Amino acid sequence: MLKKTLAALALGSALFTAGQAMAADYKIDKEGQHAFIEFRIKHLGYSWLYGRFNDFDGSFTFDEKNPSADKVKVTINTNSVDTNHAERDKHLRSGDFLNVSKNPTATFESTEVKANGDSADITGNLTLNGVTKPVTIKAKLIGQGDDPWGGYRAGFEGSATLKLKDFGIKMDLGPASQEVELLLSVEGIRQ
């Protein structure tokens, strides 16, 4: 009887530990330049203008078997906006757009993750230009596995569309430029 009890306890402990090991915390790898927060907006309806934020930090919890337990948290230095054009970047930092002197950071914190086939909808609160609104990011796992340095990584891509006026950006760029698309590529290192 004692052997059966010990065996049951060992099996139960192993299953409990295995279940816990599924969820893992990751730090976004910005130091290795394996993560990007980019955006694009139509320029007069004729072409796309691309930009990015060069300075951000974040983390996520990833459990492939239980996406509802996943979490994402990111902080962006809005002063790091970069469209490869100094005068435009200066204008984007002004009160017409990001107002970085008043709002030096933008943040995203997830509130819910729902699996949707081979992708997921990550809903959370985005604070941009001092305004907080719910946003849903359409995300997809690119891959995961061991890296050559003894670590473990997971990579995702995602996108979301934001209406500028929803975040208090009143500068009118014309009817074709009322929305901005966020384009995300994130690789995290398991902690």
From Swiss-Prot:
InterPro entries: Lipid/polyisoprenoid-bd_YceI, TTHA0802/YceI-like_sf, UPF0312/YceI. SUPFAM superfamilies: YceI-like. Keywords: Periplasm, Signal. Transmembrane segments: none annotated. Pfam families: YceI. Residues 1-23 form the signal peptide. SMART domains: YceI. GO terms for cellular component: extracellular space; periplasmic space. It comes from the Bacteria. It is found in: Periplasm. Belongs to the UPF0312 family. Type 1 subfamily. This is UPF0312 protein PA0423. It comes from Pseudomonas aeruginosa (strain ATCC 15692 / DSM 22644 / CIP 104116 / JCM 14847 / LMG 12228 / 1C / PRS 101 / PAO1).
